[in-house]
């Protein structure tokens, strides 16, 4: 029974990974083609293609890592393979968190109806900052990854050359992984998460008040404008839930509560990668350009299937 349940979660994780890789790859291909055609991208498209690329790579790295260690039965407490994976995983996770934050800020300054002078100034200036913010996010993520490697490398170097006894190696790994890294990661990931949370809550509150004002002025729930605002609210709330779930999952994952030998490992991996697999579809269906290309592909696939 346990083996069948594990197989079910492995299959579900595989399906989720394939969908995430396909959706993020689709976003990158569509916007990349437009970039090559016109030589430039709008600020929103810059963030979307950056977010799609980082999520595509993150999902790919995570999937390969999970199945490699599952198949090889490699001990998860150390080794060069783990170092190689964590370097890429930390970099891509950090970049993805920052890109999501800038996406929420851009949505906020473009859509939210706030009349404060600082917000109006930010509304005018922020789109021009987007390329530099994306580049800065990549540099920050790279520096953070190097710091993690610099702190972690001496311990694993000692582990590899077997200078520590087995008990000492275990104590070092447990102490660093369980007590030091989670707090450090919490501090680092809390910065983009706070930016995301503030901007998304401002936007949700602004849309909610605007929708209530429209209903108070006699607009029915079936009014196209009211429905558009309602859909936007639902999309933002789902983004908030998925992002918060991803943040909490990564913090708990950093604490190493669930190892690869644990029965709940595969369900937990589904929770960790849920946001980067599901949210791309929300972006596709809420973006006119992406939705149009996606609909054309569905029509082509349907015509091919019927033929």
From Swiss-Prot:
GO terms for biological process: sensory perception of taste. It is found in: Membrane. This is Taste receptor type 2 member 41. One of its GO terms (cellular component) is plasma membrane. It comes from Homo sapiens (Human). Residues 29-40, 110-129, 205-234, 286-307 are cytoplasmic. It is a multi-pass membrane protein. Glycans are attached at residue 167. It comes from the Eukaryota.
């Amino acid at each position: 029974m346990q083996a069948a349940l594990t197989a079910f979660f492995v299959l579900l994780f595989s399906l989720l990974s394939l969908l995430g890789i396909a959706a993020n790859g689709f976003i990158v291909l569509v916007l990349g083609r437009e970039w090559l055609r016109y030589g430039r991208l709008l600020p929103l498209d810059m963030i979307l293609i950056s977010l799609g690329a980082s999520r595509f790579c993150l999902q790919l790295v995570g999937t390969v890592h999970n199945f490699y260690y599952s198949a090889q039965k490699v001990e998860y407490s150390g080794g060069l393979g783990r170092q190689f994976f964590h370097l890429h995983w930390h970099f891509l996770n950090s970049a993805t968190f920052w890109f999501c934050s800038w996406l929420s800020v851009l949505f906020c300054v473009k859509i939210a109806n706030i009349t404060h002078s600082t917000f109006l100034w930010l509304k005018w200036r922020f789109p021009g900052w987007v390329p530099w913010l994306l580049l800065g996010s990549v540099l920050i993520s790279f520096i953070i990854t190097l710091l993690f490697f610099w702190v972690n490398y001496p311990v694993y170097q000692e582990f590899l050359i077997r200078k520590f006894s087995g008990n000492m190696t275990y104590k070092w790994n447990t102490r660093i992984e369980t007590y030091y890294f989670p707090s450090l990661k919490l501090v680092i990931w809390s910065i983009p998460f706070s930016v995301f949370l503030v901007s998304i809550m401002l936007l949700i509150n602004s849309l909610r008040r605007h929708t209530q004002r429209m209903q108070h002025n006699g607009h029915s729930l079936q009014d196209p404008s009211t429905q558009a605002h309602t859909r936007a609210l639902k999309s933002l709330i789902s983004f908030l839930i998925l992002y918060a779930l991803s943040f909490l999952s990564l913090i708990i994952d950093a604490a190493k509560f669930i190892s690869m030998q644990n029965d709940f490992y595969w369900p937990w991996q589904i929770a960790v990668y849920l946001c980067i697999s599901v949210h791309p579809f929300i972006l596709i269906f809420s973006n006119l350009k992406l939705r149009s290309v996606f609909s054309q592909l569905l029509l082509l696939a349907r015509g091919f299937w019927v033929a």
